[in-house]
């Protein structure tokens, strides 16, 4: 499994069924690869709108830093065969949005406990959870689902969206993307979340609301206080601009 970070919470997940073949290495070809784009929002790299050959586009919740209608309209148009998997309130919001409403017949709402199978190499995406973390009691809550990506021969990926609730379905995940810093989180909540979920590997997302210096502080604390069995990895720093940064598992 390769995971490419296009900034903030946007992830391109490529799964090849545990063949070990990476791009350019031979073995499984692109036709054997399932590609899922998660949470392309307005803090992500604009270059992600040029992605094609996607098998699914999955959205954890409706906030624009995870679901940016101008980006989504381009992606939906460029990927006419892609499944569009949406937290239910997000499906309604995008159905009502003039930039994305024309694609509504392709929308598949994914409520907690529901799952969908996508791609030439079968991959299951399951929703868990249900509610966005509280920003302030005066702000109406919105739906949010953690997205669990599973395939035979691959490690399981959990993408939590905007929540630090350790739902039973995500405890013990092989690979976890965790919100590093947010208007709705505290450092001790992030550390407690990592300690309860106990992923084998965790990597940061939701980080463009912090300066580079601030991000480094949050990442240092996450690494220092994560459980011993959890490796907190960061994205490589040497990627070409606009191409995303990739970790392989």
Locations of regions flagged by a protein language model:
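Catalytic metal-binding/acid-base residues of hydrolase active sites
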Residues: 63, 90, 129, 164, ...
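Active-site-proximal segments of metal-dependent phosphoesterases and phosphodiesterases across multiple
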Residues: 173-190, 195
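Redox-cofactor binding/interface segments in oxidoreductases and associated redox assembly factors
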Residues: 39, 58-59, 126-128, 178, ...
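Core dinuclear metal-dependent hydrolase active-site scaffold
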Residues: 1-52, 109-172, 183-186, 235-249
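Active-site metal-binding motif and surrounding structural segment of the metallo-beta-lactamase
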Residues: 42-86, 172-177
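Short internal beta-strands
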Residues: 81-89, 201-206
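Conserved N-terminal glycine/acidic-rich loop preference
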Residues: 35-37, 47-67, 93-121, 222
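Binuclear metal-ion centers of metallo-dependent hydrolases, dominated by the metallo-beta-lactamase
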Residues: 4, 96-119, 191, 195-249
């Amino acid at each position: 499994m390769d995971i490419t970070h296009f900034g903030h919470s946007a992830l391109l997940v490529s799964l090849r069924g545990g063949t070990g073949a990476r791009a350019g290495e031979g073995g499984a070809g692109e036709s054997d690869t399932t590609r899922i784009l998660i949470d392309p929002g307005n803090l992500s790299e604009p270059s992600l709108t040029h992605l094609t050959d996607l098998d699914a586009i999955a959205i954890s919740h409706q906030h624009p830093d995870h679901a940016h209608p101008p980006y989504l309209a381009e992606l939906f148009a460029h990927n006419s065969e892609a499944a569009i998997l949406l937290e239910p309130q997000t499906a309604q919001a995008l159905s009502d949005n003039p930039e994305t409403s024309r694609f509504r017949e392709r929308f598949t709402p994914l409520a907690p406990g529901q799952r969908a199978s996508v791609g030439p190499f079968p991959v299951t995406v399951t929703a868990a959870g249900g509610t966005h973390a509280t920003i302030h009691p005066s702000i109406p809550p919105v739906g949010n689902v953690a997205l669990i990506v599973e395939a035979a021969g691959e490690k399981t990926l959990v993408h939590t969206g905007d929540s630090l609730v350790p739902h039973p379905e995500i405890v013990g995940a092989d690979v976890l993307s965790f919100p590093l810093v947010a208007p709705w989180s505290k450092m001790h909540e992030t550390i407690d979340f990592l300690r309860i979920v106990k992923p084998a590997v965790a990597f940061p997302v939701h980080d463009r609301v912090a300066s580079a210096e601030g991000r480094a502080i949050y990442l240092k604390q996450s690494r220092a206080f994560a459980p011993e069995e959890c490796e907190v990895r960061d994205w490589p720093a040497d990627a070409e601009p606009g191409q995303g940064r990739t970790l392989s598992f």
